[in-house]
Amino acid sequence: MAVSLIAYGLGLFLKKKLKWAFLNPLLLSIIFVILFLQVFQIDYETYNETARYLSYLLTPATVCLAIPLYQQLKLLKENLLAVVLVIVSGVIASMGGIFVLALAFGLNHEQYVTLLPKSITTAIGIGVSEELHGITTITVAVIIVTGVLGNVIAELVFKLFRIQEPIAKGLALGTSAHAIGTSKALELGEIEGAMSSLSIAVAGILTVVGASIFANLIP
């Protein structure tokens, strides 16, 4: 567990020191841990015996994201319909995109359902993957890559498409890049963080329901 915490702390230090967008602390910590295990010839099972305790914090950490949402409750009520439509559209676009890619690359059912939960938080994504008989280890990897990518390119995309509305930024990050995207949203502002936090919960619920429907499209 200490290795994971030190690796993440080092990732944060490098991000703050160098201020490069692609130096995501989570991505760096993964690389550091892999290198550590390889150099000292430590097998994953031994490492995971202690590191798994950090996984127990995933769910309460996600629940804590409701705090900024509560602080922006009035704004949410004023834009409720637009918020719901954006999240629903984002979830459909995410799973629809996976369906199209699966057809294009000839993925089988197991590979296809493994990728369906890519845009929701790990705690929910693992459950969806298991329920649909996907490969959970790959699902976790895909979820992390999706979140890191969303975190890294978010500001570039916003500038490219001239997106300035805080609500739109928050919804986009939360719906497409789950908790890792929400960390970027919180950096951008309180409104962005609140909307992104809401998106995680709603997108997770919609994906749980919608994934079973999309899963049947490729037998």
Protein language model regions, located:
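Short juxtamembrane and helix-loop transition motifs at transmembrane-helix boundaries
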Residues: 12-20, 42-52, 70-81, 102-107, ...
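Transmembrane alpha-helices that form the ion-translocation and gating core
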Residues: 85-123, 146-161
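Entry/N-cap segments of selected transmembrane alpha helices
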Residues: 1-3, 73-98, 140-149, 199-204
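Juxtamembrane boundary at the C-terminal end of a transmembrane helix
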Residues: 103, 210-219
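Hydrophobic transmembrane alpha-helical segments of multi-pass transport and channel proteins
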Residues: 148-153, 204-209, 213
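Alpha-helical membrane segments and immediately flanking helix-loop junctions
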Residues: 111-138, 144-146, 160, 164-202
